Each structure stands twice: as structure tokens, then as C-alpha cells.
Amino acid sequence: MSGYFFTGFPGFICQELVRELLSTKQNVTNIFLLVLPAQKSMSVPIIHTYQQQFPSTTFHLVEGDITQPNLNMNKEDQQLVQEQTNYVYHLAAIYDLAVKREIAFQVNVIGTKQVLEWVKKLTNLKRLIYFSTAYVSGKREGKIRETELIHEASFKNHYEETKYLAEILVDREKEQLPITIIRPGIVKGHSQTGETTKFDGPYLMLNFLHSLRFLPLIPHLGKGEAEFNVVPIDYIVKSTCYLTHSERAQGKTLHLTNPEPISIREAYTVLMEKFLKKAPTGSIPLPLAKTFLRVPTARKWLKVEREALDYYTWRGSFDCREARRILDDADINCPSFHLTADMMVKYYNEHKYDQMKHIHIS
């Protein structure tokens, strides 16, 4: 009999993590989902679906705000959650490469600090799972290990910087709290269905190709030699559910990254061939592409964030051997990009005109 508390609902990873947990774990008594008041109405239909699929579990939509003391929960919810929670998943964050620093700092850093202070009050806590990102490495290059965190390199954007600062806060509590830190790579849709809620991350390539589909020749963007570390959502949630209950994962920081990543150039070529049935021709110098994307009209037309191009020249590589040592026991493996590209393109094709799927480009 266990209770699980989640921040970050109704975000994509959180939704899929709840579903995976209930599909694989017995005796889940209570699921507590912290939501901002403005997001409660959109969360209710999702909860109804959960209730139909998993009638033996009680679901609680709890209004709150991670940036406030006690997560801004009312006293009644606070008491119930404290009594019934054994596992906490902190996923709430600003996932936006173009976010302003003040906003990212408030949610990613202050929010994480408030979650940590609140978690210390839980008397029945068995594990805190904190979702960081592999890209807390910032502009570090070379092999990046799971045991490494502190560095003096700068960052490509405020998202990376504030997630780095937040992870430092969590890492400092490892001796006091039962913590596992998850560092995902770039998350994409389900490997078997292609399903995703937002066309961000690797889908920006498809946005770019869709906008230029009428051109007889479409070039590469720069040399594209950087590593493209993309992982499907099903690998992320299966791994996380297993690691939650693994004693070997307690106190660890783990890269949920692709152990066999491909280059950006190769990924771009694969997606173009599957999406447009043509191969790239030539190359546009990356500085020229960045200059073009300084124009808001160009960014909105292409549906591409300018900050995404910073990853085209980054020379880092993620070592995920510690995660693999633990996950190998459960035979949980990351599918290759080549094996999942067909479903990714198929799903994008079916939903490319759905504006709710596209992220806001300013």
C-alpha cells in the first residue's frame, strides 16, 4: 500500500509516468497530482481516464504552486498528502530554451528549493525522484559522467543554467534524503506509437523541413557533427519506475540517455528521407542560419527556436554506464533512433496542423 506524489502534472512526462507506474506496480493506493489552479480544468478529463483504467487507485488533484512555501497547498490537502505519501516525483519545471532567466529561476530553482523543504516534513518518505536534465553540463565538452556536476563552463541558455542550479540543491540533500536524480536526454514521443503532446526538441527539425518542403533542394544546417541524444518517452518512464524501487538507484544520479546516439546530421538525413522522400543537398553555414532566425517572422514561419541551433556545434557526450548497470537487470533498453523514426514521422504527419501540438515561438 503506497502513495505517490507528483509535481508537473499535466505535463507529458508526468502523465506517462503515472500511467506506467499504475500499469506495472501493484498496491498503489493514492496518486496525488499537484496542479496550478489554472491547469485544473484541463487535468480533470485525464484523471477520469485514469480512474476508468485503474479503479483500485484513488486519484487526488491537489491545487498548489511549487514556488510557494508548503507548495501553497491548503491545510486539508497538506495533512492528507503528508500522511499518505511514500514517493515524490518532482517534474515541474520550465522546459523552454528561449525562456527568460527570471521566470526559469523562479520555477526551476526556487520551486525546487520549496519542494525540498516540504519533502523534509514527510515522515514516510521512501524515495524522492528529481527530474533534472543531462544538459546541466552546459557548454562542457568531451565525456560527461553521471558522477559529475559542478563545473565552471557557461550555459547555452537559461533553461540549462537554472536546471543546473536546481540539481545542486537536490544533490546536497542526498545524505539527508533518499534521492535519485534522473537526467534525461532529449525526450521524444513513444517509440511504438509516436505519440507526444508537444512538437518540441527533435520535432523542430520536422517543423523546419515541413516549412521548406516545396523547395527542390533542402540543405543541411552546418556540419551537424554534434551528438543528437534523443530518447523515447516509454524508455524514460519504464526506466524511472524501475529505478524508483531499486535500492541500487538510491543516492545516485543517472543519465537516461541513448547509449548509442547518432549525429545531428544523420538524424536530419533520416527524418528528411522518411518525411519528404529526399536527401539533403549541400549545407547552410550555421552563423547564417542563426542570423536568419534573429528575425521573429522567420522563427515563427519555420516554427524553430533560435536557441536550438546552439546544440548543432556542441561537442559533448553522455556516459550512462551507471544507469545501464541497473537497468540491464530489468532488461530495459533504449531503442535506436533509426527504429523509432518511422513512428515519429507518422505521428507528426497526422498532427502537424494541430496548433495545440506546436510550442509558442516568439
Residue ranges and their predicted role:
Residues S2-N27:
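N-terminal Rossmann NAD(P)H-binding glycine-rich loop of SDR-like oxidoreductase domains
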Residues F12, V28, D319-S362:
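Amphipathic terminal alpha-helices
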Residues F59-I110, K120:
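NAD(P)H-binding glycine-rich loop region in Rossmannoid oxidoreductase-like domains
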Residues H190-Y203, L243-L254:
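Glycine/proline-rich active-site loop of Rossmann-fold NAD(P)-dependent oxidoreductases
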Residues Y242-E305, R325, Y348, K352, ...:
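Mid/C-terminal beta-alpha module of Rossmann-like enzyme folds, strongest
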